[in-house]
Amino acid sequence: MASKCLKASFSSGSLKSPGKAGGGSTRVSNMYSSSSCKLPSPSRGARSFSVCSAGLGRGNYRVSSCLPALCLPTGGFATSYGTGGGWFGEGILTGNEKETMQSLNDRLASYLEKVRQLEQENASLESRIREWCEQQVPYMCPDYQSYFRTMEELQKKTLCSKAENARLVVQIDNAKLAADDFRTKYETEVSLRQLVEADINGLRRILDDLTLCKADLEAQVESLKEELLCLKKNHEEEVNSLRCQLGDRLNVEVDAAPPVDLNRVLDEMRCQYETLVENNRRDAEDWYDTQTEELNQQVVSSSEQLQSCQSDIIELRRTVNSLEIELQAQQSMRDALDSTLAETEGRYSSQLAQMQCMIGNVESQLGEIRADLERQNQEYQVLLDVRARLECEINTYRGLLESEDSKLPCNPCAPDYSSSKSCLPCLPAVSCSTGAARTTCSPRPVCVPCPGGRF
Protein backbone atom coordinates (compact mmCIF):
# COMPACT_ATOMS: atom_id res chain seq x y z
CA MET A 1 0.00 0.00 0.00
CA ALA A 2 1.64 3.13 -1.20
CA SER A 3 1.63 5.99 1.28
CA LYS A 4 0.57 9.47 0.30
CA CYS A 5 2.65 12.15 1.97
CA LEU A 6 3.36 15.78 1.52
CA LYS A 7 5.97 16.39 -1.12
CA ALA A 8 8.33 19.31 -1.34
CA SER A 9 10.38 19.65 -4.48
CA PHE A 10 13.15 22.17 -4.56
CA SER A 11 14.52 22.55 -8.06
CA SER A 12 17.48 24.75 -8.71
CA GLY A 13 17.90 25.94 -12.23
CA SER A 14 21.21 27.79 -12.32
CA LEU A 15 23.35 29.99 -10.13
CA LYS A 16 25.06 32.77 -12.02
CA SER A 17 28.32 34.04 -10.63
CA PRO A 18 31.06 35.92 -12.36
CA GLY A 19 34.39 34.41 -12.90
CA LYS A 20 33.34 30.81 -12.62
CA ALA A 21 32.94 28.19 -15.21
CA GLY A 22 29.48 27.90 -16.51
CA GLY A 23 28.63 31.25 -15.04
CA GLY A 24 25.22 32.72 -15.29
CA SER A 25 22.29 33.84 -13.27
CA THR A 26 21.33 32.03 -10.14
CA ARG A 27 17.65 31.13 -9.89
CA VAL A 28 15.97 29.39 -7.07
CA SER A 29 12.43 28.18 -7.44
CA ASN A 30 10.42 26.45 -4.76
CA MET A 31 7.42 24.29 -5.43
CA TYR A 32 5.24 22.78 -2.79
CA SER A 33 2.63 20.25 -3.53
CA SER A 34 0.64 18.89 -0.65
CA SER A 35 -1.57 15.89 -0.35
CA SER A 36 -2.92 13.74 2.41
CA CYS A 37 -0.50 11.99 4.70
CA LYS A 38 -1.31 8.38 5.41
CA LEU A 39 0.67 5.99 7.57
CA PRO A 40 1.28 2.66 5.86
CA SER A 41 0.53 -0.67 7.44
CA PRO A 42 3.23 -2.40 9.48
CA SER A 43 3.40 -5.31 7.08
CA ARG A 44 4.17 -3.41 3.91
CA GLY A 45 4.94 0.07 2.67
CA ALA A 46 7.39 1.94 0.54
CA ARG A 47 10.51 2.83 2.45
CA SER A 48 13.44 4.13 0.42
CA PHE A 49 16.42 6.26 1.11
CA SER A 50 19.05 6.94 -1.50
CA VAL A 51 21.94 9.32 -1.87
CA CYS A 52 23.39 9.96 -5.29
CA SER A 53 26.50 12.11 -5.54
CA ALA A 54 28.43 13.05 -8.63
CA GLY A 55 31.40 14.38 -6.75
CA LEU A 56 32.69 17.97 -6.80
CA GLY A 57 32.52 18.41 -10.53
CA ARG A 58 29.56 19.10 -12.71
CA GLY A 59 26.46 17.25 -11.69
CA ASN A 60 23.68 17.15 -9.18
CA TYR A 61 23.53 16.26 -5.55
CA ARG A 62 20.13 14.70 -4.72
CA VAL A 63 18.82 13.42 -1.44
CA SER A 64 15.46 11.67 -1.56
CA SER A 65 13.69 10.02 1.31
CA CYS A 66 10.32 8.51 2.05
CA LEU A 67 9.63 8.31 5.74
CA PRO A 68 6.04 7.24 6.25
CA ALA A 69 6.64 6.73 9.96
CA LEU A 70 6.23 10.49 10.60
CA CYS A 71 3.71 12.86 9.11
CA LEU A 72 6.30 15.17 7.59
CA PRO A 73 6.34 16.94 4.28
CA THR A 74 9.41 14.89 3.51
CA GLY A 75 7.30 11.73 3.05
CA GLY A 76 8.09 12.11 -0.59
CA PHE A 77 10.89 14.67 -0.25
CA ALA A 78 13.17 15.52 -3.15
CA THR A 79 15.76 18.25 -2.98
CA SER A 80 18.13 19.05 -5.83
CA TYR A 81 20.93 21.49 -6.06
CA GLY A 82 22.14 22.21 -9.57
CA THR A 83 24.69 24.65 -10.78
CA GLY A 84 25.83 25.32 -14.27
CA GLY A 85 29.45 25.71 -13.24
CA GLY A 86 29.56 23.00 -10.56
CA TRP A 87 30.30 23.12 -6.88
CA PHE A 88 32.87 25.43 -5.33
CA GLY A 89 34.52 24.42 -2.16
CA GLU A 90 33.64 21.50 0.03
CA GLY A 91 30.29 19.70 0.05
CA ILE A 92 27.61 19.81 2.66
CA LEU A 93 28.53 16.54 4.35
CA THR A 94 31.89 15.48 5.65
CA GLY A 95 33.82 12.46 4.37
CA ASN A 96 32.83 10.06 7.17
CA GLU A 97 29.17 10.96 6.89
CA LYS A 98 29.32 10.48 3.13
CA GLU A 99 30.90 7.10 3.56
CA THR A 100 28.28 6.17 6.15
CA MET A 101 25.49 7.31 3.87
CA GLN A 102 27.08 5.50 0.94
CA SER A 103 27.35 2.27 2.95
CA LEU A 104 23.79 2.68 4.15
CA ASN A 105 22.68 3.34 0.59
CA ASP A 106 24.53 0.22 -0.60
CA ARG A 107 23.01 -1.89 2.14
CA LEU A 108 19.59 -0.49 1.39
CA ALA A 109 20.09 -1.21 -2.30
CA SER A 110 21.17 -4.77 -1.48
CA TYR A 111 18.14 -5.19 0.79
CA LEU A 112 15.84 -3.83 -1.88
CA GLU A 113 17.44 -6.11 -4.44
CA LYS A 114 16.96 -9.06 -2.11
CA VAL A 115 13.34 -8.06 -1.50
CA ARG A 116 12.77 -7.72 -5.24
CA GLN A 117 14.40 -11.09 -5.82
CA LEU A 118 12.24 -12.70 -3.11
CA GLU A 119 9.13 -11.11 -4.61
CA GLN A 120 10.09 -12.43 -8.03
CA GLU A 121 10.70 -15.89 -6.57
CA ASN A 122 7.37 -15.71 -4.74
CA ALA A 123 5.59 -14.67 -7.94
CA SER A 124 7.31 -17.46 -9.88
CA LEU A 125 6.37 -19.97 -7.18
CA GLU A 126 2.77 -18.73 -7.23
CA SER A 127 2.65 -19.02 -11.02
CA ARG A 128 4.17 -22.51 -10.85
CA ILE A 129 1.67 -23.54 -8.15
CA ARG A 130 -1.19 -22.09 -10.22
CA GLU A 131 0.01 -23.90 -13.36
CA TRP A 132 0.46 -27.12 -11.43
CA CYS A 133 -3.03 -26.80 -9.93
CA GLU A 134 -4.47 -26.12 -13.40
CA GLN A 135 -2.64 -29.16 -14.72
CA GLN A 136 -3.77 -31.29 -11.78
CA VAL A 137 -7.44 -30.27 -11.97
CA PRO A 138 -8.33 -32.74 -14.77
CA TYR A 139 -6.66 -35.56 -12.87
CA MET A 140 -8.28 -34.60 -9.57
CA CYS A 141 -11.77 -34.24 -11.03
CA PRO A 142 -12.08 -36.64 -13.97
CA ASP A 143 -15.27 -36.74 -15.96
CA TYR A 144 -16.93 -40.12 -15.57
CA GLN A 145 -20.31 -39.08 -16.97
CA SER A 146 -19.83 -40.99 -20.24
CA TYR A 147 -18.77 -44.10 -18.33
CA PHE A 148 -21.74 -43.68 -16.00
CA ARG A 149 -24.13 -43.36 -18.96
CA THR A 150 -22.63 -46.48 -20.56
CA MET A 151 -22.91 -48.33 -17.24
CA GLU A 152 -26.54 -47.23 -16.85
CA GLU A 153 -27.38 -48.41 -20.39
CA LEU A 154 -25.67 -51.74 -19.73
CA GLN A 155 -27.51 -52.06 -16.42
CA LYS A 156 -30.83 -51.35 -18.18
CA LYS A 157 -30.02 -53.97 -20.82
CA THR A 158 -29.02 -56.42 -18.10
CA LEU A 159 -32.28 -55.78 -16.22
CA CYS A 160 -34.28 -56.27 -19.44
CA SER A 161 -32.39 -59.50 -20.14
CA LYS A 162 -33.01 -60.66 -16.58
CA ALA A 163 -36.73 -59.86 -16.89
CA GLU A 164 -36.91 -61.72 -20.23
CA ASN A 165 -35.01 -64.63 -18.70
CA ALA A 166 -37.38 -64.68 -15.72
CA ARG A 167 -40.39 -64.62 -18.09
CA LEU A 168 -38.94 -67.51 -20.10
CA VAL A 169 -38.23 -69.40 -16.88
CA VAL A 170 -41.85 -68.86 -15.78
CA GLN A 171 -43.11 -70.09 -19.16
CA ILE A 172 -40.85 -73.14 -18.96
CA ASP A 173 -42.06 -73.81 -15.42
CA ASN A 174 -45.68 -73.47 -16.56
CA ALA A 175 -45.01 -75.91 -19.42
CA LYS A 176 -43.38 -78.28 -16.94
CA LEU A 177 -46.40 -77.97 -14.66
CA ALA A 178 -48.77 -78.70 -17.57
CA ALA A 179 -46.64 -81.68 -18.57
CA ASP A 180 -46.66 -82.89 -14.97
CA ASP A 181 -50.46 -82.51 -14.87
CA PHE A 182 -50.86 -84.49 -18.08
CA ARG A 183 -48.41 -87.07 -16.77
CA THR A 184 -50.35 -87.40 -13.53
CA LYS A 185 -53.63 -87.68 -15.47
CA TYR A 186 -52.09 -90.35 -17.69
CA GLU A 187 -50.76 -92.20 -14.68
CA THR A 188 -54.19 -91.93 -13.04
CA GLU A 189 -55.93 -93.29 -16.12
CA VAL A 190 -53.35 -96.07 -16.39
CA SER A 191 -53.88 -96.98 -12.74
CA LEU A 192 -57.67 -96.94 -13.23
CA ARG A 193 -57.32 -99.13 -16.33
CA GLN A 194 -55.10 -101.51 -14.39
CA LEU A 195 -57.65 -101.60 -11.56
CA VAL A 196 -60.50 -102.30 -14.02
CA GLU A 197 -58.42 -104.97 -15.72
CA ALA A 198 -57.65 -106.50 -12.32
CA ASP A 199 -61.37 -106.45 -11.47
CA ILE A 200 -62.19 -108.01 -14.83
CA ASN A 201 -59.57 -110.68 -14.26
CA GLY A 202 -61.02 -111.35 -10.81
CA LEU A 203 -64.52 -111.55 -12.22
CA ARG A 204 -63.26 -113.85 -14.94
CA ARG A 205 -61.78 -116.13 -12.34
CA ILE A 206 -65.07 -116.07 -10.46
CA LEU A 207 -66.89 -116.78 -13.74
CA ASP A 208 -64.55 -119.68 -14.39
CA ASP A 209 -65.21 -120.99 -10.90
CA LEU A 210 -68.94 -120.65 -11.44
CA THR A 211 -68.62 -122.33 -14.82
CA LEU A 212 -66.75 -125.18 -13.17
CA CYS A 213 -69.44 -125.39 -10.49
CA LYS A 214 -72.11 -125.38 -13.19
CA ALA A 215 -70.27 -128.11 -15.09
CA ASP A 216 -69.98 -130.14 -11.88
CA LEU A 217 -73.67 -129.67 -11.18
CA GLU A 218 -74.55 -130.59 -14.77
CA ALA A 219 -72.33 -133.66 -14.47
CA GLN A 220 -74.08 -134.54 -11.21
CA VAL A 221 -77.46 -134.04 -12.91
CA GLU A 222 -76.36 -136.24 -15.80
CA SER A 223 -75.11 -138.87 -13.41
CA LEU A 224 -78.36 -138.65 -11.47
CA LYS A 225 -80.30 -138.94 -14.71
CA GLU A 226 -78.23 -141.93 -15.74
CA GLU A 227 -78.73 -143.40 -12.32
CA LEU A 228 -82.45 -142.74 -12.63
CA LEU A 229 -82.53 -144.40 -16.00
CA CYS A 230 -80.58 -147.30 -14.59
CA LEU A 231 -83.00 -147.50 -11.70
CA LYS A 232 -85.93 -147.32 -14.08
CA LYS A 233 -84.41 -149.99 -16.26
CA ASN A 234 -83.67 -152.17 -13.28
CA HIS A 235 -87.16 -151.55 -11.99
CA GLU A 236 -88.70 -152.50 -15.31
CA GLU A 237 -86.53 -155.54 -15.48
CA GLU A 238 -87.52 -156.49 -11.98
CA VAL A 239 -91.14 -155.80 -12.76
CA ASN A 240 -90.97 -157.87 -15.90
CA SER A 241 -89.18 -160.64 -14.08
CA LEU A 242 -91.76 -160.48 -11.33
CA ARG A 243 -94.54 -160.45 -13.85
CA CYS A 244 -93.02 -163.41 -15.56
CA GLN A 245 -92.81 -165.19 -12.26
CA LEU A 246 -96.32 -164.17 -11.37
CA GLY A 247 -97.70 -165.30 -14.70
CA ASP A 248 -96.94 -168.90 -13.82
CA ARG A 249 -98.56 -168.66 -10.44
CA LEU A 250 -101.90 -168.32 -9.21
CA ASN A 251 -103.62 -165.12 -8.96
CA VAL A 252 -103.89 -164.61 -5.37
CA GLU A 253 -105.44 -161.44 -4.27
CA VAL A 254 -104.12 -160.33 -1.07
CA ASP A 255 -105.43 -157.44 0.76
CA ALA A 256 -102.19 -155.33 1.15
CA ALA A 257 -101.05 -151.80 1.11
CA PRO A 258 -101.39 -149.98 -2.09
CA PRO A 259 -98.34 -150.25 -4.25
CA VAL A 260 -95.87 -147.39 -4.38
CA ASP A 261 -95.88 -145.38 -7.55
CA LEU A 262 -92.25 -145.17 -8.56
CA ASN A 263 -92.89 -142.56 -11.21
CA ARG A 264 -94.39 -140.34 -8.64
CA VAL A 265 -91.51 -141.02 -6.33
CA LEU A 266 -89.06 -140.24 -9.09
CA ASP A 267 -90.97 -137.13 -9.94
CA GLU A 268 -90.86 -136.08 -6.33
CA MET A 269 -87.15 -136.79 -6.18
CA ARG A 270 -86.69 -134.90 -9.39
CA CYS A 271 -88.62 -131.99 -7.99
CA GLN A 272 -86.63 -132.10 -4.80
CA TYR A 273 -83.34 -132.14 -6.67
CA GLU A 274 -84.51 -129.40 -9.02
CA THR A 275 -85.59 -127.26 -6.09
CA LEU A 276 -82.27 -128.03 -4.41
CA VAL A 277 -80.39 -127.12 -7.57
CA GLU A 278 -82.51 -124.00 -7.98
CA ASN A 279 -81.86 -123.03 -4.37
CA ASN A 280 -78.16 -123.69 -4.79
CA ARG A 281 -78.14 -121.66 -7.98
CA ARG A 282 -80.05 -118.83 -6.32
CA ASP A 283 -77.75 -118.96 -3.34
CA ALA A 284 -74.73 -118.90 -5.65
CA GLU A 285 -76.21 -116.03 -7.63
CA ASP A 286 -77.06 -114.15 -4.45
CA TRP A 287 -73.59 -114.76 -3.07
CA TYR A 288 -72.09 -113.71 -6.39
CA ASP A 289 -74.27 -110.60 -6.47
CA THR A 290 -73.42 -109.70 -2.88
CA GLN A 291 -69.75 -110.29 -3.49
CA THR A 292 -69.93 -108.28 -6.70
CA GLU A 293 -71.75 -105.45 -4.93
CA GLU A 294 -69.25 -105.50 -2.11
CA LEU A 295 -66.40 -105.51 -4.59
CA ASN A 296 -68.03 -102.70 -6.56
CA GLN A 297 -68.55 -100.71 -3.38
CA GLN A 298 -64.96 -101.35 -2.39
CA VAL A 299 -63.85 -100.39 -5.91
CA VAL A 300 -65.96 -97.22 -5.82
CA SER A 301 -64.75 -96.27 -2.35
CA SER A 302 -61.17 -97.09 -3.26
CA SER A 303 -61.52 -95.19 -6.56
CA GLU A 304 -62.97 -92.22 -4.66
CA GLN A 305 -60.17 -92.43 -2.14
CA LEU A 306 -57.71 -92.81 -4.99
CA GLN A 307 -59.16 -89.79 -6.79
CA SER A 308 -59.10 -87.73 -3.61
CA CYS A 309 -55.54 -88.87 -2.95
CA GLN A 310 -54.60 -88.14 -6.54
CA SER A 311 -56.20 -84.69 -6.36
CA ASP A 312 -54.35 -84.10 -3.09
CA ILE A 313 -51.15 -85.32 -4.74
CA ILE A 314 -51.77 -83.05 -7.73
CA GLU A 315 -52.41 -80.07 -5.44
CA LEU A 316 -49.33 -80.91 -3.44
CA ARG A 317 -47.30 -81.24 -6.62
CA ARG A 318 -48.61 -77.91 -7.85
CA THR A 319 -47.78 -76.36 -4.51
CA VAL A 320 -44.32 -77.93 -4.63
CA ASN A 321 -43.81 -76.73 -8.21
CA SER A 322 -45.00 -73.22 -7.34
CA LEU A 323 -42.70 -73.22 -4.32
CA GLU A 324 -39.84 -74.48 -6.49
CA ILE A 325 -40.57 -71.75 -9.05
CA GLU A 326 -40.68 -69.15 -6.29
CA LEU A 327 -37.48 -70.60 -4.86
CA GLN A 328 -35.80 -70.40 -8.25
CA ALA A 329 -37.05 -66.82 -8.69
CA GLN A 330 -35.76 -65.91 -5.24
CA GLN A 331 -32.45 -67.61 -6.00
CA SER A 332 -32.15 -65.77 -9.32
CA MET A 333 -33.07 -62.53 -7.55
CA ARG A 334 -30.51 -63.30 -4.86
CA ASP A 335 -27.87 -64.03 -7.52
CA ALA A 336 -28.76 -60.78 -9.30
CA LEU A 337 -28.59 -58.86 -6.04
CA ASP A 338 -25.28 -60.55 -5.17
CA SER A 339 -23.86 -59.62 -8.56
CA THR A 340 -25.21 -56.09 -8.21
CA LEU A 341 -23.74 -55.89 -4.71
CA ALA A 342 -20.39 -57.16 -5.97
CA GLU A 343 -20.45 -54.65 -8.83
CA THR A 344 -21.43 -51.85 -6.47
CA GLU A 345 -18.73 -52.84 -3.97
CA GLY A 346 -16.15 -53.00 -6.75
CA ARG A 347 -17.24 -49.65 -8.16
CA TYR A 348 -17.29 -47.96 -4.78
CA SER A 349 -14.00 -49.59 -3.80
CA SER A 350 -12.42 -48.23 -6.99
CA GLN A 351 -13.96 -44.83 -6.30
CA LEU A 352 -12.73 -45.05 -2.69
CA ALA A 353 -9.25 -45.91 -3.93
CA GLN A 354 -9.38 -42.96 -6.32
CA MET A 355 -10.64 -40.71 -3.54
CA GLN A 356 -7.89 -41.96 -1.24
CA CYS A 357 -5.32 -41.29 -3.97
CA MET A 358 -6.81 -37.83 -4.47
CA ILE A 359 -6.81 -37.26 -0.71
CA GLY A 360 -3.19 -38.42 -0.55
CA ASN A 361 -2.28 -36.07 -3.40
CA VAL A 362 -4.18 -33.21 -1.76
CA GLU A 363 -2.54 -33.96 1.60
CA SER A 364 0.88 -34.00 -0.05
CA GLN A 365 0.03 -30.73 -1.81
CA LEU A 366 -1.25 -29.36 1.49
CA GLY A 367 2.00 -30.41 3.15
CA GLU A 368 3.98 -28.71 0.40
CA ILE A 369 1.81 -25.60 0.70
CA ARG A 370 2.25 -25.63 4.48
CA ALA A 371 6.00 -26.00 4.02
CA ASP A 372 5.92 -23.11 1.53
CA LEU A 373 3.85 -21.09 4.00
CA GLU A 374 6.31 -21.87 6.78
CA ARG A 375 9.18 -20.87 4.51
CA GLN A 376 7.36 -17.71 3.46
CA ASN A 377 6.57 -16.95 7.11
CA GLN A 378 10.25 -17.36 7.93
CA GLU A 379 11.15 -15.10 5.01
CA TYR A 380 8.47 -12.68 6.16
CA GLN A 381 9.97 -12.67 9.66
CA VAL A 382 13.39 -12.08 8.11
CA LEU A 383 11.94 -9.22 6.05
CA LEU A 384 10.29 -7.82 9.17
CA ASP A 385 13.66 -7.89 10.90
CA VAL A 386 15.22 -6.23 7.87
CA ARG A 387 12.46 -3.62 7.90
CA ALA A 388 13.08 -2.96 11.59
CA ARG A 389 16.78 -2.53 10.91
CA LEU A 390 15.98 -0.30 7.93
CA GLU A 391 13.67 1.79 10.09
CA CYS A 392 16.49 2.17 12.60
CA GLU A 393 18.87 3.18 9.81
CA ILE A 394 16.27 5.56 8.35
CA ASN A 395 15.83 7.14 11.77
CA THR A 396 19.61 7.48 11.87
CA TYR A 397 19.48 9.04 8.39
CA ARG A 398 16.76 11.42 9.46
CA GLY A 399 18.78 12.44 12.50
CA LEU A 400 21.80 13.08 10.29
CA LEU A 401 19.71 15.09 7.82
CA GLU A 402 18.10 17.13 10.57
CA SER A 403 21.52 17.81 12.09
CA GLU A 404 22.85 18.87 8.67
CA ASP A 405 19.76 21.01 8.03
CA SER A 406 20.29 22.74 11.38
CA LYS A 407 23.90 23.48 10.43
CA LEU A 408 22.99 25.07 7.06
CA PRO A 409 22.64 28.93 7.00
CA CYS A 410 19.36 30.45 5.94
CA ASN A 411 20.88 32.85 3.32
CA PRO A 412 24.65 32.72 3.14
CA CYS A 413 24.72 35.10 0.19
CA ALA A 414 23.00 37.99 2.03
CA PRO A 415 25.21 40.89 3.27
CA ASP A 416 23.65 40.78 6.72
CA TYR A 417 24.59 37.16 7.03
CA SER A 418 25.10 35.97 10.51
CA SER A 419 26.48 32.59 11.41
CA SER A 420 24.17 32.45 14.37
CA LYS A 421 21.09 32.46 12.15
CA SER A 422 19.85 29.15 10.93
CA CYS A 423 17.04 27.88 8.81
CA LEU A 424 13.68 27.73 10.39
CA PRO A 425 12.82 24.20 11.31
CA CYS A 426 9.59 22.55 10.43
CA LEU A 427 6.72 22.45 12.79
CA PRO A 428 6.78 19.74 15.39
CA ALA A 429 6.02 16.47 13.70
CA VAL A 430 3.46 14.18 15.17
CA SER A 431 2.93 10.59 14.25
CA CYS A 432 0.10 9.92 11.86
CA SER A 433 -2.62 8.26 13.83
CA THR A 434 -6.36 8.10 13.53
CA GLY A 435 -7.04 10.63 16.29
CA ALA A 436 -4.05 13.00 15.80
CA ALA A 437 -4.31 16.09 13.61
CA ARG A 438 -2.15 16.18 10.51
CA THR A 439 0.36 19.08 10.28
CA THR A 440 2.46 20.28 7.38
CA CYS A 441 5.79 22.01 7.23
CA SER A 442 5.75 25.73 6.72
CA PRO A 443 7.67 27.09 3.71
CA ARG A 444 11.23 28.00 4.44
CA PRO A 445 14.05 29.31 2.26
CA VAL A 446 16.36 26.94 0.52
CA CYS A 447 19.97 26.94 1.63
CA VAL A 448 22.41 26.80 -1.26
CA PRO A 449 26.19 27.25 -1.24
CA CYS A 450 27.59 30.62 -2.13
CA PRO A 451 29.48 31.05 -5.37
CA GLY A 452 32.57 32.18 -3.52
CA GLY A 453 32.73 29.00 -1.54
CA ARG A 454 31.72 30.59 1.74
CA PHE A 455 30.14 27.86 3.78
UniProtKB/Swiss-Prot annotation:
Q: Which family does it belong to?
A: Belongs to the intermediate filament family.
Q: Where is this region: Coil 1B?
A: 144-244
Where is the stretch described as Linker 1?
133-143
Q: Which InterPro entries match?
A: IF_conserved (IPR018039), IF_rod_dom (IPR039008), Keratin_I (IPR002957)
Report domain IF rod positions: 97-408
Q: Write out the GO MF terms.
A: structural molecule activity
Alphabetical GO CC annotations of the entry are: intermediate filament
Record lineage? Eukaryota, Metazoa, Chordata, Craniata, Vertebrata
UniProt region (Coil 2), positions on chain: 261-404
Q: Which organism is it from?
A: Mus musculus
Known PROSITE patterns for this protein? Answer: IF_ROD_1, IF_ROD_2
Q: Where is this region: Coil 1A?
A: 98-132
Q: Which SMART domains match?
A: Filament (SM01391)
**Region Linker 12: what ranges?**
245-260
Stretches for region Tail: 405-455
Q: Show the Pfam families listed in the entry.
A: Filament
Keywords, A to Z, come to: Coiled coil, Intermediate filament, Keratin
Task: Look up keyword Iron-sulfur and say if it applies.
Answer: no
Looking at the record, which segments are called Head?
A: 1-97
Protein's UniProt name: Keratin, type I cuticular Ha5
User: What further fact does the record state?
Assistant: There are two types of hair/microfibrillar keratin, I (acidic) and II (neutral to basic).
Mind telling me which residues the site (Stutter) is annotated on?
Answer: 316
The answer on whether this UniProt entry bears the keyword Coiled coil reads: yes
